[in-house]
């Protein structure tokens, strides 16, 4: 078969499997997820061996340290993947939940009930844990899932998908409920994006180029999981010790993830007192600083920041820094250069914090805490499918409920329309 025919067959099988999944009880879905988790742990040596192939090829191709970190699987990360499946099993099942019910003057009872979306296509790059996380969330929400990972993780993704599918089939679920597109070139993606009769939603997770390619070529609705140009604004009433802890955590804990800090904004009234202090600390942690003229006047070791730096998602130990006149300029900067991901303000002024929350155009706005909390688990959603920077149909970290939609249910007693 041609690539087009194979992808069409995968999509058709997923559509058929989605009808089976939509009828599964919560108990059966949970048993399925627990079996998948156990299988991952049992097959950990095999997964590590397959992942080693991807890591070696990545090193030979010169992948960045951040990309290699995203790609790497070890016993600890595999155990974390399995635990994530168990956590999804423990979450409330949204399918079948009646979210609203009201009575009409003619005594009709009208409600809205959560139902699966159907078939979800997920296109991602070098993060093999997405294979397990996405499968777990989609299946718990009653959806079939078609995965297309990047070539950097092809061996890891094939191994994970095969293990999960085997566990799934052993529980009587059709194999088509979890599919992996076996092609790593763009033609496979293009064919996937044409399957509007079988796939209900596409979720791309990756770099700017991938997001643009998918958005421009898809016949299917797309929820973008765009880059994370995350900001922290140190306001004039900020507690410096608190600001230090938050900035260090947001920038250095895991710089290669989308909720890491990329741009630091500092109110001019505290710049002279705070910048030398934070610049010294970050420099000692090997963070490269790129600042505007006012920032560099107080931190001469910083490199000049260009216009491109304000838009940059570095995913490395690099931080763009700017001194702003006031809260207005901080908000304007974020709304101009941000990517609708996560922004934080450090302040002791409740009113200014509330204004920041209201006026910043972002899917997650944080007060006096790290941007690293923009994560489904950290926010109490359980595992997430990603962080949506698209306002329709979901905005911010996407959990189980965001993988469902609603349908109207109407109860009558013989009513007819007059």
Swiss-Prot record:
<comment type="function">
    <text>Catalyzes the NADPH-dependent reduction of L-glutamate 5-phosphate into L-glutamate 5-semialdehyde and phosphate. The product spontaneously undergoes cyclization to form 1-pyrroline-5-carboxylate.</text>
</comment>
<dbReference type="InterPro" id="IPR016161">
    <property type="entry name" value="Ald_DH/histidinol_DH"/>
</dbReference>
<dbReference type="InterPro" id="IPR016162">
    <property type="entry name" value="Ald_DH_N"/>
</dbReference>
<keyword id="KW-0521">NADP</keyword>
<dbReference type="InterPro" id="IPR015590">
    <property type="entry name" value="Aldehyde_DH_dom"/>
</dbReference>
<comment type="similarity">
    <text>Belongs to the gamma-glutamyl phosphate reductase family.</text>
</comment>
<keyword id="KW-0560">Oxidoreductase</keyword>
<dbReference type="InterPro" id="IPR000965">
    <property type="entry name" value="GPR_dom"/>
</dbReference>
<protein>
    <recommendedName>
        <fullName>Gamma-glutamyl phosphate reductase</fullName>
        <ecNumber>1.2.1.41</ecNumber>
    </recommendedName>
</protein>
<dbReference type="GO" id="GO:0004350">
    <property type="term" value="F:glutamate-5-semialdehyde dehydrogenase activity"/>
</dbReference>
<dbReference type="GO" id="GO:0055129">
    <property type="term" value="P:L-proline biosynthetic process"/>
</dbReference>
<keyword id="KW-0641">Proline biosynthesis</keyword>
<keyword id="KW-0028">Amino-acid biosynthesis</keyword>
<dbReference type="InterPro" id="IPR012134">
    <property type="entry name" value="Glu-5-SA_DH"/>
</dbReference>
<dbReference type="InterPro" id="IPR016163">
    <property type="entry name" value="Ald_DH_C"/>
</dbReference>
<keyword id="KW-0963">Cytoplasm</keyword>
<comment type="pathway">
    <text>Amino-acid biosynthesis; L-proline biosynthesis; L-glutamate 5-semialdehyde from L-glutamate: step 2/2.</text>
</comment>
<dbReference type="Pfam" id="PF00171">
    <property type="entry name" value="Aldedh"/>
</dbReference>
<dbReference type="GO" id="GO:0050661">
    <property type="term" value="F:NADP binding"/>
</dbReference>
<dbReference type="InterPro" id="IPR020593">
    <property type="entry name" value="G-glutamylP_reductase_CS"/>
</dbReference>
<dbReference type="GO" id="GO:0005737">
    <property type="term" value="C:cytoplasm"/>
</dbReference>
